[in-house]
């Protein structure tokens, strides 16, 4: 082997070897235990960022480790290739989304290969290819035939900049998640999939996901939002109309003082027809923010409709108000207001001088003070007629039962989860396979006309979708009847909801999935991706799997057994203030910094001499210009160093702070491993280790080696604490570096240790380990080598170090045989002269012995 560690030579050669040998290509093999490891597929934005590198390194480490355990490991990769950014980039670069996307895929594919990820490239998919989305279109038509798909006009979150609909989850603080433009409300026809039909399953099956992070499961539970309550019907004075509301607090029903309805509710619209001021208010509400966080904090506004509802139990007339905080899409578009016991109702009632009636006693049994705020805690009913004195549960049931008995109430389980709106008014997406015939009938595209192909050779004007702008594209016939194709495209979450299943049979042409392959590989054993996908992608991913199961395409209930959510990658962020007061962000690569003796940044300037403000560590992003290009780091240090730093610098699920000094440290460590192996191999051939004749020092070193193997095995396999696994190997390397190399036995032990170290590091740093394995004379390629197994016998301690205390104070430490009795330990302690002087002339009154650890002699 060469004397110097040169990653640029090693990595190119090893990657070429993997490519030629197709090392990571797999097929179904019933004789082997399978393991499917999957990282969330990337959007081909043009360049990999450090977040990608972290995600894919974690997946690759797990995959390589599982291969070494002898499993048949599938690790595929592909491209989530549709989506809005491609349209913007195409306009900006005067091209079309397709060529821009395919160029990016090619570039990023090469970047992934440079990092040495062990993917089965034969299974690569791009979701924008017709051979992928044809099956998505086919499945949608099947869901339509099953009654799982419908179209309705609904108020949507509309981004006026991107000219598209946003899901509620994509509205952040009232603005578009992508471009930060203020979101508006708009009524348009949309296609929906009935995810609400699966709400109960999606909720209950979270309990089966024992190896998913608790945080993700909690977020999904809250998003599904199961509640038990009562649907209540109110009559409306002088009207045939009925008003229906849902409440989870029927115990407060005697405290209702008004009813609030959405601006778009039929009663609001009826009243607005003769009330111009109300009509203006209804129009204003059309642009109300709809993200829940916004709803909670925005100013509550309303207007009396002049209509009244009748309380079903008391007969009281309750004013009906149109309010901006009630949404037509949620529940019935009407809520009963109990201002005494609901914060939002109290705020509204206080603003508009509506009555506030307390009906629940305070915890101390007194009437609550409602002058400053509502009392929202549960308690004993009062002011509630026949229900006075009942506790919360009894009050809930008694009032619910009475409403049911009177025929004006019905117990109901409700969910916060809404049906999934999958229509997008964009071009670069899979066309929705539906046709409107000339008589107005809507039918699915026949199977023999699938896929409905998206034309790729288009001109982007940045305003309208090319397929909407071209009247010819939509024209088609179904069974000889002319019709128009749907020009909306699918939400891109559709593609990423089933890609994991298509990886099991990407070339299969006879259907969406090959049942044999899908059921061999599925469910995914390990899924890796960011926590930011907890409620969108990961919910749709689980939902789609259940749809596939119910269509007979897979036979498992959940798509992934184990989920690891990696933390974000942070980097230093610097800026200076421009002439117009704006912040101009400067890359940390271009910042010249001064640090204090604790390493803290005290001063920074850029090359032009601007004094920089240090904004701390923040997520690597384009907006703060603090991304570090992985390719630059790979060229400077090698892929193995970058991978090692990524896995060592922080626990996988925590944020990782990018520090180039840490990268240099990882590089120095690999050079040390290389140097130790070089020095060892330079001494020539090694004889076999004779375990029976090891010296005490050699036994101790071998014990450390096998304890390290046991720890690293547990850390990588069960605990997934990869940083502590690497730390354990580093600690062992320090001991190996100090170990004598005089005798044949010394060298034989070093050979055993280095072969184990190289295998333990292989999942993290595969290129250098491939070379070292060859240099050390390992059998075959390391790619097929088994994971090292800890020798239980080697780990048995021959002796123990026992701390000796006299009256609770440490007076000495003694080495005793591992199987020494308490009496033998006491005798040995008495011979230790540091201990003996404290026992001279005193009586031992009590002995406390913790076997193999501590001896405390109480004397007097």
From Swiss-Prot:
Its EC number is 6.1.1.4. Signal peptide: none annotated. SUPFAM superfamilies: Anticodon-binding domain of a subclass of class I aminoacyl-tRNA synthetases, Nucleotidylyl transferase, ValRS/IleRS/LeuRS editing domain. A motif ('HIGH' region) lies at residues 42-52. It comes from the Bacteria. It is found in: Cytoplasm. GO terms for molecular function: aminoacyl-tRNA deacylase activity; ATP binding; leucine-tRNA ligase activity. Gene3D superfamilies: 2.20.28.290, 3.10.20.590, HUPs (3.40.50.620), Isoleucyl-tRNA Synthetase, Domain 1 (1.10.730.10), Valyl/Leucyl/Isoleucyl-tRNA synthetase, editing domain (3.90.740.10). One of its GO terms (biological process) is leucyl-tRNA aminoacylation. A motif ('KMSKS' region) lies at residues 619-623. It is an enzyme of class 6 (ligase). ATP binds at residue 622. It catalyses: tRNA(Leu) + L-leucine + ATP = L-leucyl-tRNA(Leu) + AMP + diphosphate. CDD domains: Anticodon_Ia_Leu_BEm (cd07958), LeuRS_core (cd00812). Belongs to the class-I aminoacyl-tRNA synthetase family. PANTHER family: LEUCINE--TRNA LIGASE, MITOCHONDRIAL, LEUCYL-TRNA SYNTHETASE. This is Leucine--tRNA ligase. It comes from Yersinia pestis. The gene is leuS.
């Amino acid at each position: 082997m060469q004397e110097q560690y040169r990653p640029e030579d090693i990595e190119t050669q090893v990657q070429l070897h993997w490519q030629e040998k197709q090392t990571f290509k797999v097929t179904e093999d019933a004789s082997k235990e399978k393991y499917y490891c999957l990282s969330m597929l990337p959007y081909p934005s043009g360049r990999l960022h450090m977040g990608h590198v972290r995600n894919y390194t974690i997946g690759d480490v797990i995959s390589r480790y599982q291969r070494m355990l002898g499993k048949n490991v599938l690790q595929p990769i592909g491209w989530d290739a549709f989506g809005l950014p491609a349209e913007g980039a195409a306009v900006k670069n005067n091209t079309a989304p397709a060529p821009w996307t395919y160029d990016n895929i090619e570039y990023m594919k090469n970047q992934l290969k440079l990092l040495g990820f062990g993917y089965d490239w034969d299974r690569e998919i791009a979701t924008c290819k017709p051979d992928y989305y044809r099956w998505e279109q086919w499945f949608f038509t099947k869901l339509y035939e099953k009654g799982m798909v419908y179209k309705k006009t609904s108020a949507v979150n509309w981004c006026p900049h991107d000219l598209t609909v946003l899901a509620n989850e994509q509205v952040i603080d009232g603005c578009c998640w992508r471009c930060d433009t203020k979101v508006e409300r708009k009524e348009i026809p949309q296609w929906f999939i009935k995810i609400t039909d699966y709400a109960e399953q999606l909720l209950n099956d979270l309990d089966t996901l024992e190896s998913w992070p608790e945080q993700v499961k909690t977020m999904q539970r809250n998003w599904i939002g199961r509640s038990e309550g009562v649907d209540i019907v109110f009559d409306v004075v002088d009207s045939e109309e009925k008003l229906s509301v849902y409440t989870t607090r029927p115990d407060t029903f005697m405290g209702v003082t008004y009813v609030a309805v959405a601006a778009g509710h039929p009663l609001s619209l009826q009243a607005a027809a003769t009330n111009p001021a109300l009509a203006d208010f209804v129009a204003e509400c059309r642009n109300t923010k709809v993200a829940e966080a916004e709803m909670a904090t925005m100013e509550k506004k309303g207007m009396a409709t002049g209509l009244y509802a009748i309380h079903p139990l008391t007969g009281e007339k309750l004013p009906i108000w149109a309010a901006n905080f009630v949404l037509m899409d949620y529940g019935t578009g009407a809520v009963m207001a109990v201002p005494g016991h609901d914060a939002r109702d109290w705020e509204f009632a206080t603003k508009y001088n509506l009555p506030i009636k307390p009906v629940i006693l305070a915890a101390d049994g007194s009437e609550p003070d409602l002058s400053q705020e509502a009392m929202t805690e549960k308690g004993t009913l009062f002011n509630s007629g026949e229900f006075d004195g009942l506790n919360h549960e009894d009050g809930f049931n008694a009032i619910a039962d009475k409403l049911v008995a009177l025929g004006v109430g019905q117990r109901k389980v409700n969910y916060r989860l809404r049906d999934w709106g999958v229509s997008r008014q964009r071009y670069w997406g899979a066309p929705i396979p539906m046709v409107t015939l000339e008589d107005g009938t809507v039918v699915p595209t026949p199977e023999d006309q699938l896929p409905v192909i998206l034309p790729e050779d288009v001109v982007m004007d940045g305003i309208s979708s090319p397929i909407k702008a071209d009247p010819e594209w939509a024209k088609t016939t179904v069974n000889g009847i002319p019709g128009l194709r749907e020009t909306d495209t699918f939400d891109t979450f559709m593609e990423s909801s089933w890609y994991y299943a298509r990886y099991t049979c990407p070339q299969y042409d006879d259907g969406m999935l090959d049942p044999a392959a899908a059921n061999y590989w599925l469910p995914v054993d390990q899924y890796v991706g960011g926590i930011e996908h907890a409620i969108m992608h990961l919910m749709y991913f689980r939902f789609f799997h259940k749809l596939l199961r119910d269509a007979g395409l897979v036979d498992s209930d959940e798509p992934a057994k184990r989920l690891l959510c990696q933390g974000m990658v942070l980097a230093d962020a610097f800026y200076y203030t421009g002439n117009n007061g704006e912040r101009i962000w400067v890359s940390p690569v271009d910042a010249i910094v001064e640090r204090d003796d604790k390493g803290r940044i005290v001063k920074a300037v850029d090359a032009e001499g601007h004094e920089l403000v240090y904004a701390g560590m923040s997520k690597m992003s384009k907006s703060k210009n603090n991304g570090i290009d992985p390719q630059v780091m790979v060229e400077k240090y090698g892929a193995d160093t970058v991978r090692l730093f990524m896995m060592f610098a922080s626990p996988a699920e925590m944020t990782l702070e990018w520090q180039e000094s840490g990268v240099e440290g990882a590089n120095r460590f690999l050079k040390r491993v290389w140097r130790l192996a070089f020095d060892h191999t330079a001494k020539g051939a090694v004889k076999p280790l004779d375990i029976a004749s090891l010296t005490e020092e050699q036994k101790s070193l071998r014990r450390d080696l096998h304890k390290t193997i046991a720890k690293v095995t547990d850390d990588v396999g069960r605990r997934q604490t990869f940083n502590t696994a690497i730390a354990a190997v580093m600690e062992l390397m320090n001991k190996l570096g100090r170990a004598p190399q005089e005798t044949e036995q010394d060298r034989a032990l070093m050979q055993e240790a280095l072969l184990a170290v190289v295998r333990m590091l292989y999942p993290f740093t595969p290129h250098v380990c491939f070379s070292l394995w060859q240099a050390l004379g390992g059998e075959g390629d390391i790619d097929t080598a088994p994971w090292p197994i800890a020798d239980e016998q080697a780990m048995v301690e021959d002796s123990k170090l026992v701390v000796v205390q006299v009256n609770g104070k440490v007076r000495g430490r003694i080495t005793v045989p591992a199987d020494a009795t308490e009496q033998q330990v006491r005798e040995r302690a008495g011979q230790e002269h540091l201990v003996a002087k404290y026992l001279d002339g005193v009586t031992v009154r009590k002995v406390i012995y913790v076997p193999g650890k501590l001896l405390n002699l109480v004397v007097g």
